[in-house]
Amino acid sequence: MTEQTENATRLARPLIRLAKLVGVATSYVGMSHDYHEIEDDVLVAVLGALGIDASNDEAINQSITSIKSERETRVVAPTVLHVVGKESKVEVHGGMFDVPEASITLENGKQFTGKISHEGGEKIAHEINGSFFFTSYLVLPADLPEGYHTLEVTVGSETETATVISAPEKIELLDDMKNGSLWGWMSQLYSIRSKGSWGVGDFEDLKTMLVEAKKKTGSDFMLINPMHAAEPVPPLTPSPYLPISRRFINFSYIRPESMPEYLTLSHEDRAEVDALHEQVELLNDDARLIDRDAMWRVKKHALWVIYKAGRTKARQAEFDRYLAECGDEIESYATWCLCYDKWGAPSDDADNWVRKYNRDSEEVAQLREKFPDTLEFYRWLEWVATDQLHAAQQAARKAGMKIGIVADMAVGVHPAGSDVWWNPERFAKGATVGAPPDMFNQQGQDWSQPPLNPIALEQTGFRVYRDMVHGMFANAGAVRIDHILGLFRLWWIPEGKPATDGTYVHYDSDVMLGILALEASRAGGVVVGEDLGVVPAYVSKSLSEHGILGCAVEWFEQMDGVFRTPKDWRPYALASVNTHDMPPAAGYLEYGHVKLREQLGLLSGPVEEFQKSATAEHNAMLNMLVEEGYLDKAALDDEAANENEIVDALYRGLKGSPCKLMAASIVDAVGEKRTQNQPGTNNEYSNWRIPLADGEGNVVPLEKLFDEPRLQEITAIMRG
C-alpha cells in the first residue's frame, strides 16, 4: 500500500515546517488517490511568491522566527470573523498583567454599545527579544450586528485595529427552494444574438432572454458566463475567465441604442450611430466564429458619439453617485484603460508601460492630465455597463423570475490587467493558478492567472474580495463561484514550471465564506460553488454548513464506472447535464470530446484507451437511463436516429433529482454539438467564440430561440 503521509524525518525539516506554518502544502492526494510529496524547489519558489525567503537554510530559519514573532507579539490579528448570534473569541497578546481595552466602530460610523468582555488564556509565556507575551481573549457578544466593523484594541501602550467581519452563520434558502426546487437555463451570452445585436450578444439581449425565458418556459434563472471586465481596445481576450478585473464589468456588452442618451441624439449623431451598427449587423447571422474585435471597433466609435453628446442633469447626477460609490477603485480601472488606449497593449517587454510604470509614476499622472476626456469616457462606459446589467436583472425580477441572473465569478484575473497593475501587493509574484492532473486534463492546467496573496488578504480585511462579491450581488440574484475550492486552497504553479509541478496554498476559507454569507443574505441571494474534481470532505462539509450549494453534473455523478441514480444526488446542488468545458449533450453522445482531444494532442496515452474508457462511460450512462425508466431500451438499437430521445432522457434524469436548482443548457435545447471551451488549450482551439447554432450549423437568433420546438420539448421535461 502506498504511503499516504509524510514521515517524521521529512516533517522535522525546516523547509517543511516553514511551508506548513504559512499554509503551503508539502504533499497532496490526487483524484486517483495517488500520493505526492512536493519537491523542495517548488516549495522554495511558492514561498518566494508569498514574499517569504526560503532561499537557504539560514533564510528559512530566519523566516520561521520572524513569522512566529509577528504572530505572538501583535495585539490583534488584522481580520476577525464573528458569527452573528454567537459569541466570538478574539485572541489578543500582551504582558501578563495587561488588561485589553476594546471598542468597536460599526460600519455606519456609530459606536457599538454592547459589552465586550475579557477572558484569560493559557499562562504560557512567549519570549520574543527579551520580552514575555501572553495570550488572552476578547469576547465579542452575540448581539454584534452584521457588517464590516472596526475593532480597536489597546494593550499597555500598544493600540492596533482589526476589521471585524460579522456575518450570518449560513445563507438561507429562498422560500421556493426550501420545500422544492427551481429550474433555469445556462448560456454563453456573447453567443446569442438578435437583430439588434452588434455581432455579439449584449445586455439588451440578456434582458430579452430573461423576460422571454420566464414568459415562454416558466424558468426562474439564467446562468451566464462571467461579466468581468475585458480590454478597452481590440484585441479582446475571448475567455471570460481571464478578465482584466473582477471588480468591474465588461463594457463591450453595452447596447448603445438602449441608452436614454441615444434617444436624445441629434439627427446627425443618431444617423452616425445607426450607420455604424449596420457595419456589423450581418455578423448576427454568421455561423462562423464570434468576432468580438470587429464588434468593439465599431461599437466603441458609436459610444464615443453618444458620450460626446452629453447627458441630462438627472443622468449626470446618477453618474456622479456611481463614481462616489466606486471610490478609488474606478480611478484605478479607468487609468489602466487610458494607459492601454494611449500606450498600447501590455506585454512582457521590460520597456512596456505595464512593467515600466506604476500607479504613482509621474508619466501616468501626466497622461491623466493630458487626456481627461478619455479618462472620463472609461469611467462613463463602466457606469453605463453597470446600469444596463442592473436593468436586465430588474426586468427578470419584474417578469416573475425568483432569481434572475446567476452571475459567474472567475477564479482570477489577467496578470497584466488593471487589478494586478494598480495593486500588485494584493497578488503573489512569480506564480500562477491552475489545477493538478486529473482524468479530464491529464497534463494539469495552468490558467495563467496570478493568485491573490492570502497574507495580503488578511492584512487588508479581505477588502478586495468583499468589494468584488458585493458588486456581483448588486446585479444578480445568485452568484456561482468558479472553482470554489479556491476559497480553501489553490494550486500554485511557480513561474517556468509545468502545471504538474505545483502545490496547494491554503486560504482563510472561514472568512471568505463568511463574506459570501453576509453579501448573499443582504441581497436575498443564493451562492453556488463549483466543486467538481478533487474536493476534500472538509470542503464539502464547510460549504454545506454555510448554506452554499454545490454542483452536480450528470456525466460526473459516477463511482468506479457506475452512475448514481439521479434520485440519489445530493439535494443542495445546482444540477446540470453538462458544463461549458464539455461538448453539448448531442456532441458528447457522438464522442466529440474524444475526437477533439485526439485532434489537439491532449491525450497522454493512446487514443484507443481513451475511446475505450469513453465508450464504457457512454454505455453505463445509457444503461442507467434505461434501468431508471428515463429511456426506452429500443432507442439503443439506433442511437443516431434516436439522438433527441436520448438527450431527453438525460434531462428526465436531471429532473428526477432532488437538487434545489436545475439548469438546462441552451445549446442542448437547440441541438448544438460544438464544444464551447476545451481546457488545456489557448489558440489551438476556438474557445469562447462559438455562436449559438443548431445541429446543422444554422444560427439560432434570439427572436426564434424560445419558440424552437426542441427547446420547448426540453422545457416540457423541466417543467414536469
Outline where the language-model segments fall.
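Carbohydrate-interacting/catalytic domains
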Residues: 1-224, 262-267, 521-522, 526, ...
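Alpha-amylase-like alpha-glycosidases and glucanotransferases acting on alpha-linked glucans and related
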Residues: 109, 233-386, 412-661, 667-668, ...
